[in-house]
Amino acid sequence: MKDMIRLTDYKADDLYDIFKLTDEVRQGKYQDLLKGKSAILFFPNSSIRTIVTFEKGIYLLGGQPILFSTETLDKKEDLRDVCGYLNHWADIVIARHKDIHLLEKMAEYLEVPVINAMTDVNHPCEMLTDMYALSKIRKDFTKDRFLFVGGKGNIGLAWQEASRVMGFELQQCCGQGYEMGGLMSYNNIYDAVVGKDIVCTDSLPASALTDFKECQVTTAAMKMANEDAILNPCPPFYRGEEVSKEVMESKNIF
């Protein structure tokens, strides 16, 4: 396992191995795994959660995070040349960039691992984190029925990617015309949530709010889901838009 670009590059057993490794890290193993090593990060200035958690994780494992703006990868200089230099200096490269094909090219040119920290079509580390957390609170999250509330963006496509690898059932609730394809979809949250165990959301662009007015996750909607169903909103979330203020303060929140 060299790179993490798409979850679909791996099998379910590979992801379970990552979960086991995560358990070992949490138990205090590998504290000096990255001692004397440098991790090069490419992130936009707007990133908060992902960059903080990556930098802290690298630090706790003894490594040195070195941060650049994502725009650095869009310069005129040939990407092959940039990666040639990084091969001498970096031990791992972690990048957030809208174009997944750029990350795939980096993985081709680099001799060190490349980690996808989000693109326009997926977010594998977000999915690994969510599924690992679910594995700690659910008997078998792959047997749960998932509902994604949102449009055809990177988070929805990421959940679809995860479902293909892990085999859990996934359906979508969205405004008309926002369907991802390949999934059963609903245009009303009260119909969509029936029989579901895990309700996942993504934030909405202002232009889509009217189209999603029947899709807001509320406490009343969560009561229509299965017993012990949980709400897993992807941050940043916006109260009064994809989720109600009340449901974000309820016992259903994950």
Task: For the regions a language model picked out, list residue spans one by one.
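Phosphate-coordination loops involved in phosphoryl transfer and adenosine-cofactor binding
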Residues: L34-A39, T142-D144, D228
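Positively charged, low-complexity intrinsically disordered leader regions
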Residues: M1-V52
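Short hydrophobic/aromatic-enriched beta-strand-loop microsegments
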Residues: P113-M118, L170-C173, K251-F254
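Phosphate/diphosphate ligand-binding glycine-rich loop within oxidoreductases
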Residues: L34-S135, Y238-R239, V243
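Glycine-rich phosphate/diphosphate-binding loop of Rossmann-like nucleotide-binding domains
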Residues: P44-K56, S135-T201
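Hydrophobic/aromatic ligand-binding patch that stacks against planar heteroaromatic rings
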Residues: G57, M106, A162, A221, ...
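Rossmann-like adenosine-cofactor binding region
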Residues: G181-I253
